[in-house]
């Protein structure tokens, strides 16, 4: 009778586009959460958490049925009970749903939220881009003033500086509103239709359903057409022009670095007026190429003219937006993005309520922090190691640990080992300054051995004096 060949169990790895956050990296993630909480709370943003999955219809209605996210990137599934659900691909739709469902409409406005969490998109994984990814986000609902757009950008700037990131800048643009976009859409169609044969397959579809998304295509053969495409900034209505000019004045006053990118659009249909992206020039493997840098110039209205002598109407902008082109190639990696979404609340069943928000990618921030060699406060250095011998030593160990914890003394241990020699080797390897040794005799006598690792000198002390003596030795 032949011997049966043993079948090797199948091994597993993390799903494509996902990653483990390992113990040695946790300090970076804790740093992001800690700094974001402190800064966002200071600016009166309230923490909110929403489910990782929502009704599929929420994203169809909010994000837009013709967007790449809805058509290609959502993880959707049906339950046995017949529910159609989707893992959240972005945060804003869920925040607005929670705002409406939980009665925030009755609260004093604006309502300001911040959040952190995981999101999911079926994209092609690459460095800095995952299918499960984490974001830190801000949302403000209930204020149309451009100063709120500037506040979102300002708070993100403060956050990045607090992390120690030295260089970053914002790309900003206005995508207008329902009053000025139809005319611009017609101009785009006039420009792109004769070039339809040269477009990629996705852009041929966008030409029919969502022409503005043509400006966001990453295919090189489509990008070359963008150079001479009409600019929305030239076709903004007066209200949108004033709003955008006001935003730029706020950014100038705050000293926030920005570049006007008149071809910047976002991949979500709900955006109106302000849109922005945040970049760093640090080499993290990502690359953004802009054919021409657009320099914004705010030309003040001359002081002494008949027009200037007329009293200004409240809200009137005393500046003209002028765009100058300078050939330049910029390389960088996107850290985050955002914009205004004045129609989304009503689109999801609420009253007309202006809103603005944005989000930063946490994976990219962690990668950047590592690349820059930023010092991140970690856990307190372990300077004490606990060595036990016998069952009595093990049983008494938890009381010892708790006493050390209450006094802020970090301790290492290996309770599963019985050999004192092997435990002392681990203590030495860990870099601990002191070992506490608890054997059978010490456990019975309520004493403990304190050993200095550098000299090997040790003494027996009462457990009641352990904390006092430890603190004195650790101060040396």
Language-model-detected regions and their locations in the chain:
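TRNA-recognition modules of translation machinery and tRNA-sensing kinases, especially anticodon-binding
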Residues: 2-476
């Amino acid at each position: 009778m032949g011997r049966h060949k043993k079948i090797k169990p199948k091994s597993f790895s993390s799903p494509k586009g996902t990653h483990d956050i390992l113990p040695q990296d946790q300090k970076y993630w804790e740093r992001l959460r800690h700094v974001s909480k402190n800064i966002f709370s200071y600016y009166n943003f309230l923490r909110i958490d929403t489910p990782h999955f929502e009704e599929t219809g929420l994203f169809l209605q909010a994000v837009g049925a013709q967007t790449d996210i809805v058509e290609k990137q959502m993880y959707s599934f049906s339950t046995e009970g017949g529910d159609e659900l989707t893992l959240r691909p972005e945060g804003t739709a869920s925040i607005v749903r929670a705002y409406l469902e939980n009665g925030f409409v009755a609260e004093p406005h604006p309502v300001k939220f911040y959040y952190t969490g995981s999101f999911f998109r079926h994209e092609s994984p690459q460095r800095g881009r995952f299918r499960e990814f984490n974001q830190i986000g801000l949302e403000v609902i209930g204020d149309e003033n451009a100063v709120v757009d500037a506040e979102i950008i300002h708070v993100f700037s403060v956050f990045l500086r607090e992390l120690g990131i030295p260089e970053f800048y914002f790309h900003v643009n206005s995508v207008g509103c329902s009053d000025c976009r139809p005319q611009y859409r017609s101009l785009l169609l006039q420009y792109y239709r004769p070039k339809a044969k040269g477009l990629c397959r996705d852009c041929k579809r966008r030409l029919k359903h969502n022409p503005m998304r043509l400006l966001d295509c990453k295919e090189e053969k489509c990008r070359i057409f963008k150079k001479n495409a009409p600019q929305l900034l030239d076709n903004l209505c007066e209200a949108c022009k004033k709003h955008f000019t006001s935003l730029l004045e706020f950014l100038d006053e705050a000293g926030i670095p920005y570049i006007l990118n008149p071809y910047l659009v976002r991949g979500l249909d709900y955006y109106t007026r302000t849109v922005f992206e945040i970049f760093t020039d640090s080499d993290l493997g990502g690359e953004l190429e802009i054919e021409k840098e657009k320099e914004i110039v705010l030309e003040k209205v001359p002081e002494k003219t008949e027009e200037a002598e007329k009293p200004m109407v409240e809200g009137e902008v005393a500046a003209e937006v002028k765009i100058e082109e300078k050939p330049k190639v910029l390389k960088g990696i996107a850290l985050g993005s955002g914009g205004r979404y004045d129609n989304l609340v009503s689109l999801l069943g609420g009253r007309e309520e202006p809103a603005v928000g944005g989000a930063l990618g946490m994976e990219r921030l962690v990668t950047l922090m590592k690349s820059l060699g930023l010092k991140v406060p970690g856990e307190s250095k372990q300077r004490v190691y606990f060595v036990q011998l016998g069952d009595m030593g093990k049983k008494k160990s938890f009381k010892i640990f708790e006493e050390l914890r209450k006094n802020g003394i970090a301790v290492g241990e290996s309770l599963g080992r019985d050999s004192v020699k092997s435990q002392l080797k681990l203590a030495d390897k860990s870099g601990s300054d002191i070992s506490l040794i608890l054997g059978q005799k010490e456990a019975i006598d309520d004493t403990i051995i304190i050993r200095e690792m550098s000299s090997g000198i040790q003494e027996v002390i009462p457990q009641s004096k352990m904390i006092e003596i430890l603190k004195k030795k650790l101060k040396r």
